[in-house]
Amino acid sequence: MIGDTRLKYDDLRKALIELLSTIYEGEIQLVGLSRLSGGANMETWAMDAVLDNSSHPLILRRMPGEKNDLNQVGNIDLATEAELITIAADHGVAVPQIVHVLCPSDGLGIGFLMSREPGLALPKRILKDPDLKKAREVLAFECGKVLAKIHSIPLEKIPTSLEHVGEIDINKTMQVKLDNYANSSPVHQLALNWLRDNLPVPREKALVHGDFRNGNILVDTNGITAILDWELAHIGNPVEDLGYLCGNVWRFGNHDQPVGGFGQYDDLLDGYRAVAGWAPEVEEVRHWEIYCAMNWAMACLTMLDLYRSRADASIERAAVGRRLSESEIDLLLLLDGKV
């Protein structure tokens, strides 16, 4: 059974065949339908739609359940995410192509179908695969270029439903969450107090991806092939994305490579500057790393609450929730000498 909808595999397969046969105007064969690992918030399914010896590699991204808990984890709705991906593509950002946004008559719940792009997304493979050695050497620079493209998308092109999130708003939201979850960690409160007293450099507002990190980029031997998972996108300070990418939690053990575990600050900022014409100082990026560590703490607390309340007792929720102490260690290291 799949998520809370109790949609069986055979029913999912049947509904997909009917939908894809309509999309591709012919009786398709559905090959290799399988759920991909990872993804604490969404279900991700890979498949190939085959018609007349032509194969269409696809990804289905859908809500895992009838109860919409997107507000609790801070996500935009999937229809808006699909719209945003299309807008990003129109502005030169490497993203999958949106094939279809699900509607109730499709019988598949809430979600969308998109093209399955080549490349690897698993962080450990990106960091260790010998075939990606040359790609890793320029990956931080390429990430900087991609982020600058995202941040340059005119705000008037962005869906109006996207939230505008300022630094003060972030601090207030995190305080509410801490209080709601009993505020049992003095480290988290210490870090939040520091962030409240030390606001980052103000920047002109831009589209912020919100989850740009190792694990949400597809990489092959030539470099970045697609940027994934736009569910946390919002309008805010563009340097947030740069700091988030450099968060210790997304280095996967490669602590000496601050950019995603594969690169250095200077390479990231050089790539950003090459497209945007400017780049923040490293210290400004590191300031946002503190926000990243606090955001990770909020994510862990939220997942833990979903699991404990049995609102979603999946192993993915529990696995993230148990990592709460990591954020405390990261925050103490980041704040060392600042408080």
Question: Where is each model-derived feature located?
Answer:
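Juxta-kinase regulatory segment immediately upstream of eukaryotic protein kinase catalytic domains
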Residues: 1-27
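ATP-binding pocket architecture of kinase catalytic cores
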Residues: 34-192, 197-204
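All-alpha amphipathic helical-bundle segments outside canonical DNA-binding/catalytic cores
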Residues: 162-165, 279-291
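Conserved protein kinase catalytic-loop anchor
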Residues: 205-207, 225
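Catalytic-loop of the protein kinase fold
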Residues: 207-209, 214
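Activation of the activation-loop gatekeeper triad in protein kinase-fold domains
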Residues: 228-233
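Active-site activation/catalytic loop segments of kinase-like enzymes and analogous catalytic loops
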Residues: 241-277, 291-310
